């Protein structure tokens, strides 16, 4: 088949590699609007078991990724300077650019070279392709085509992705008060020298702060002041660090005619559960498997992809939306005592009950039970 992949992010690069690896006879072309090596953001994070699927289906790529990742075994909550450790909740992270470089190397190994600096306004140039894959992210050109019946709505909080040269020891959620209202930061190292630092605030605080009316540098200075004790003198670093509201993207149809969507072009998962990149890679693997199984019977392959992937994806996306709801009200949660705040945080996505937490995080649960005992006396 002749296949066009629109978008050279993790989903597009990985799908291109898998399709060509599985069937060298496929003609695979990847079109990316940005120049090579030009990417936004800083690091991406995965839960500690999130890449197990990759080890099962593609151990070679897994073995290339794992040594390049930063790993830790605990999560830390920092409520106004008081810290609580959630033991046993591990994560791993890698720089987004480094991830793209590894996936590009895999792609090159099967003889596919993406075409960079190729922005697209429509899909007319793909009239002779058997399959067109939209892996072109939030502002997908492919998704704009009729037939997908997509819906986009914005959550109320505002956030921005920054970086810093302070390498944090573990993934930490830091919650602080400002003269205008509450702020929180999701921060974690993705290399020995750099960390991602995502800052979030609610709509009321955003409006009171006047952040929409000041310069990028003024916003950075304000955030460096709010999180001064967390950053310990290290400045925030920008890379297309635009303040915005999180878009929830959902599509009634995953494919239409010979077009199909994957990754953020198809769905979004709130960054508070750290699954966006994982879901994109899983989409690529699921679509490639369906095509491998059905061969040139494209419609059957696309139907199988949607039928088998949709239930799995829906659970994670639903959990991310539940988590996002908690963050929409994080200022209210900050009024809780630290142990109750941590309990509320853990319950935010509705996926972990208390019995399971005793197994996953025994030290934290022992502390929580002792706290409950103390306040009942």
Short names for language-model regions:
Residues 11, 36, 139:
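Conserved Rossmann-like nucleotide-cofactor binding loop
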Residues 21, 62, 67, 289-377:
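C-terminal helical "tail/cap" subdomain of flavin- and related membrane-associated enzymes
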Residues 35-53:
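Conserved N-terminal glycine-rich FAD pyrophosphate-binding loop of Rossmann-like flavoproteins
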Residues 105, 128-246, 250:
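Conserved FAD-binding catalytic core of PHBH/FMO-like flavoproteins
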Residues 1-3:
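Extreme N-terminal starter segment of soluble prokaryotic enzymes
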Residues 5-21, 133-134, 242-322, 326:
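Conserved mid-domain beta->alpha element of the FAD-binding
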Residues 20-41:
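Glycine-rich FAD pyrophosphate-binding loop
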Residues 47-161, 365-377:
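Conserved N-terminal helical subregion
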